[in-house]
Amino acid sequence: MHKKLKISVKFFKLLLLILLLNNNANSQYLVSCNFLNSSSSSLLSGATGLVLDFDVDMYKMTYNTINTQGIPTIATGAFCIPANTTCKNFPFAIYNHGTSLRKDNVPSYNNIEALIGKVFSAGGYFVCMPDYIGMGDSPGLHPYVHAETEATAAIDMVRAAREYLANNTSFMDNGETFITGYSQGGHACMATHKYIQDQNLTNEFNVIASAPCSGPYDLSGIMADTIISPTPYSNPGYIVYLLASYQLAYGNIFSSWSDVLYPPFDTIVSPFFSGNNTSLDMSLLNSLIPNDMSLLIRDTCMNNFMNDSVNMNHPWWVALLENDNYDWLPTAPIRMYYCTGDEQIAYTNALNAEAAMNNNGALDVQAVNVGNGNHGNCVLPALSAAFNWFQTLKTPCDFTNSKDVSKLNTQISPNPFKEKIMIESSEIIDIEIFSPVGKSIYFNSNIKDFRIETSSWPKGVYIVKTQSGKNLHSSILIKN
């Protein structure tokens, strides 16, 4: 019992044997999580042709996050858990959905795109599908293609999901995180991955890989070219959505729609961006406004924008540059799946990102062509490729170690924690606590009830091993 507990490097690389504590933790992110429906693996496999091992339960989650001004707000999303299995240790996957104007056309309302998250979950993942702020039951207008809040909506949902698992289930978060998304969700995927790395959150979110699909990563290049180009654009509603979003986020894009759009389009678009739209969709908006940007956007606005293409000090340029996410140096692998026939989001977004990242010194970044389909037809091959790639990288569930790991009558609280953790045990135990990178930061033996000061510990996910005799208990603690 006095000998220091042993733990292998593989344990930390794979984070097996992690049992989320079943105690009454204080939820800092989770507001509610309510069951919606169940789906069988056979149904999901038949719809996709993928090999899927697990049935899936889907929940509607409401959680705390922040808006574009950093002010607390709520967001919603769909949360999927593998069901009817003795396996308990799964990685997290984040699926970011595509463009939607209707607040109710989102995963938490069980829309068609929610099927994608169910499929990933059936492959063995806890899946978070954020609706994004301003969508679902979140108040106000959605800040479309706003990188920071796309990221925080996803990150805070995973935090809320961890709280739910810890307090309501016996499932284990195995410490791995995978991120994907399609269309706008591709941008959100890239934004989330970049934010985790930029904000030094890798201890809390161990990103194994990300797979952005058909996304607009190069806003200041390719999207700007779309605005300026005389070539008609198939989805002019995207441009209007972008203007509305960045006006919400930055407040300096326009004063009123009539300042930036010609009549009658200035009055036509307004109801689509009221902040409570549940009936007007993108296809309707595209049908009501011209595909030629010179007929939609006033000459004065367009000329001011075009004439500043070198210095890029115009508010539109500043906003686009702020939300670019193609030119950075990822430390985890990325695959950007695309189709060459995409009429909505130019596949050169992926090529530009691949070139920029590799030029920056990235070790494992590729843009992958999955066919010549259009934007709609690219969904299945792109996301199937992402799924199959993730399956080669994730840690398989350890069915043996998922059983009989909670024989010790020991409680550790609170979880999540901040300044201290309390250990209460009915028997003498040894305890060792490890940082997310595998470093032992605390060890004590032959103890029972005691307190550990944790104020100096950084935020992240900590692994706790307790042992009494031959009984070993592995668990996870989260510091927020």
For each predicted feature, which ranges?
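Short, surface-exposed "cap/lid" segments of acyl-processing enzymes
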Residues: Q69-P72, A83-V119
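C-terminal catalytic histidine-bearing segment of alpha/beta-hydrolase fold enzymes
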Residues: A224, W317-A319, N323, Q344, ...
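Catalytic-loop region of hydrolases
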Residues: S27-T86
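C-terminal outer-membrane/trafficking sorting elements
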Residues: M1, N26, V405-N480
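Short beta-strand/loop motif that positions the catalytic acidic residue
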Residues: M336-D342
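Accessory cap/linker subdomain of secreted extracellular hydrolases
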Residues: C213-D327
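Primarily recognizes the serine-hydrolase "nucleophile elbow" in alpha/beta-hydrolase
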Residues: A160-P232
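Alpha/beta-hydrolase active-site loop
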Residues: Y144-N167
